[in-house]
Amino acid sequence: MLFRSKYGVTVNAILPGWIATDTQPEHERLQGMKTPLGRSGKPEEIASAVAYLASPEAGYITGQSIVVDGGNSIIEERGW
């Protein structure tokens, strides 16, 4: 996608963690409770990250993977 960058196109990714929904299975809810924040994320929190990346304020951010997981990736890296 770098060839599109000259047109102002940015390409990023959101990597969500456990997200609470009406259909979230119990085992996923329990996994969310094990994150450093002690809960699953909210759909609105993912939407906020997407909205930011789509905003003019993020115009110089490209090629990034933004982790929105309540710190879960940190504890997984350390094997906690």
Model-identified regions with their sequence ranges:
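Conserved functional loop/turn residues at catalytic and ligand-binding sites
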Residues: 8, 22, 39, 56-57
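Conserved SDR Rossmann-fold cofactor-binding beta-strand/turn motif
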Residues: 10-20, 54, 67-69
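Short, small-residue-biased leader/transition segments that mark boundaries at the very start
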Residues: 1-2
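A glycine/serine/threonine-rich, flexible loop-to-helix segment
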Residues: 6, 13-35, 45, 75-80
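A conserved structural motif in NAD(P)-dependent oxidoreductases
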Residues: 35-46, 57
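Short, small/polar-rich loop/turn modules that mediate ligand/substrate recognition or access, typified
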Residues: 5, 10, 61-63
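Short C-terminal tail/terminal secondary-structure segment
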Residues: 62-80
